[in-house]
């Protein structure tokens, strides 16, 4: 699929400078922006209108999930796809103002033999102008339409906040929805039906992305021993990372993909080891009687966090990649696990045992920790690529589902239905345009 910006020569009255929103969503005094995502005007093949409606629906869902927007009911729209204009001069701003809409997104889609040309534009209702910085054209196949919607949502959020959104991303997780044992699944950010990636017929845990987003790690007990495997996203074949019968409980690629951190069990003692990308040991980083697991890299590649029982109960520690500079960074109670380092390096999220199990977000040095969940069972946080959101596994009414929240914990959205005990989420890196 190609990403092409709309030429300014095509535009009428426009506004290009964004009114950037500062601070976190749902902060004091914040208001969700009423937005209308109109089904696209379709031409060409018979499925064009349906694809145009799907684009609009996905875009609306993405923007509502962000917490910045409130999508309006399409039944209130005063313009219809087959008759609406696509410029500011042909947009009925008076009618749109009556619906309460502040922004309107509309456009056109042409489908010929499965090939799609799509144009989407955003209009500011109070100013009665088109927002030039947001208009986009896309070319691709019918199957690319969801990604076109995600990229449009990314562009709108970047216009609003100054930072690209997380919408054109994916989430790995483990689930039993395909049978009695868990496998690795993946779905797009908006919760489209998950796609099964593995068929292990064994216990599977701890999926983690390669920084390219093209492959992933996971731990399988297929040989009755936890071992680390890697698999390309488009493949059905996984290969072992470390040769021989070596027990590895979890692993994580470095930000540049050149190294791996793994929790390796040797003689009943689990420590953190540094490997090269081919699985060759480079260095043992921890050497303690306590259990050291769940390594997560800092974005700069010079530090990592992990969970250790060295103090007598699980806590989160940070260490330099050369094995020095050990310091504890978890201070919420006596039981803290599953660290996840934020993409910007300024925060670490982890699970704490408090009124069940809750998610904590703290500074990378452990200061300023706050709960982003309050009750129930909530575990295994993973950061969105923009660092504004997290996904975690939660127990809801006897089901295990994946839930998204902002980093302040002011909103929560369920992303899966819990059909198969959904756990161990891992949010992907950004996908390149």
Regions found by a protein language model. Name each.
Residues 126, 188-192, 232-236, 276-280, ...:
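Short loop/turn segments that connect beta-strands within beta-propeller blades
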Residues 26-91, 105, 109-111:
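Short beta-strand->alpha-helix linker/helix-N-cap micro-motif
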Residues 154, 164-189, 194:
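An edge-strand/N-cap motif at the start of beta-rich repeat modules
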Residues 164, 175-183, 199-202, 219-228, ...:
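A flexible loop/linker signature enriched in serine peptidases of the S9 family
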Residues 21, 86-155:
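Amphipathic beta-strand/beta-sheet edge segments enriched in Tyr/Trp
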Residues 165-167, 211-212, 255-256, 299-300, ...:
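Residue-level detector of Asp-centered blade-edge/turn motifs that repeat once per structural unit
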Residues 171, 216, 257-261, 301-305, ...:
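Hydrophobic beta-strand positions that form the internal "hydrophobic ladder"
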């Amino acid at each position: 699929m190609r990403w092409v910006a709309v030429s300014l020569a095509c535009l009428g009255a426009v506004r290009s400078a964004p009114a950037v929103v500062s601070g976190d969503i749902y902060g004091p005094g914040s208001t969700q922006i009423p937005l209308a995502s109109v089904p696209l005007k379709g031409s060409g093949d018979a499925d064009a209108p349906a694809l145009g409606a799907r684009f609009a629906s996905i875009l609306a869902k993405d923007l509502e999930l962000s917490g910045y927007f409130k999508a309006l009911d399409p039944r209130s729209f005063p313009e219809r796809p087959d008759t609406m204009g696509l410029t500011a001069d042909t947009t009925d701003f008076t009618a749109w103002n009556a619906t309460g809409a502040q922004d309107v997104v509309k456009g056109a889609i042409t489908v010929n033999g499965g090939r799609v040309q799509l144009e989407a534009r955003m209009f500011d209702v109070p100013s009665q102008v088109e927002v030039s910085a947001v208009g986009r054209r896309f070319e691709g196949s019918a199957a690319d339409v969801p990604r076109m919607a995600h990229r449009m949502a990314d562009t709108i959020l970047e216009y609003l906040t100054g930072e690209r959104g997380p919408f054109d991303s994916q989430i790995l997780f483990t689930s039993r929805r395909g049978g009695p044992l868990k496998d690795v699944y993946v779905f797009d950010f908006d919760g489209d039906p998950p796609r099964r990636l593995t068929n292990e017929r064994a216990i599977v845990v701890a999926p983690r992305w390669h920084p390219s987003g093209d492959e992933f790690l996971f731990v399988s007990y297929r040989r009755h021993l936890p071992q680390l495997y890697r698999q390309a996203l488009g493949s059905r074949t996984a290969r072992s990372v470390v040769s021989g019968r070596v027990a590895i409980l979890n692993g994580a690629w470095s930000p540049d993909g050149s190294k791996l951190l793994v929790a390796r069990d040797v003689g009943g003692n689990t420590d953190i080891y540094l490997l090269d990308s081919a699985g060759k040991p480079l260095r043992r980083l921890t050497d303690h009687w306590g259990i050291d697991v769940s390594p997560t890299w800092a974005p700069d590649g010079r530090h990592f966090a992990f969970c250790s029982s060295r103090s007598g109960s699980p806590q989160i520690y940070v260490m330099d990649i050369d094995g020095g500079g050990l310091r504890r960074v978890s201070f919420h109670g006596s039981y803290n696990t599953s660290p996840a380092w934020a993409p910007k390096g300024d925060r670490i999220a982890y699970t704490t045992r408090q009124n069940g199990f809750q998610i904590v977000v703290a500074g990378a040095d452990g200061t300023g920790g706050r709960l982003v969940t309050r009750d129930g069972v909530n575990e295994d946080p993973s950061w969105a690529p923009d660092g504004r959101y997290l996904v975690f596994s939660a127990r809801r009414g006897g089901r295990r589902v994946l839930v998204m929240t902002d980093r302040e914990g002011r909103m929560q959205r369920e992303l899966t239905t819990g059909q198969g005990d959904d756990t161990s989420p891992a949010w992907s890196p950004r996908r390149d345009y």
